[in-house]
């Protein structure tokens, strides 16, 4: 009945200013062995454990070099499992844009012909009091997350766990938690 952090070790020595797409996973020890043990300990009695751990272990065995690539693959595989189809993933590193912070977000939205940029609530500090979306046709919306409740193994519901928690507990039924969701 407690939450825990799952972390993946990365190579960081002398790499303080690296871009997110340059962060390498540290394979000097098996970075996923501990994660799988923690997941087994905490979720093995969940109804959908076998199904979800199989997806995760398949991904972990791929020896993906960069953390961003691992994140992308995890998102894609979760979308596939939940039958969320027709979504295109575009890496900002492939767009040849050199601006920074809030301006970068605006430039990406504009380059992709977006008319709305959805930002996490509380991320206004990222714009440093200079809102590049102001006085443009692109609308900046702040996403205020209202956490859905679902059946968990614990007696008391623990909010703000990752989608992995939801998947272990609800499996494909997790789709219902997103069906009527609006921003």
Regions found by a protein language model. Give the residues of each.
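Residues lining hydrophobic/aromatic ligand-binding pockets adjacent to catalytic sites
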Residues: 1-183
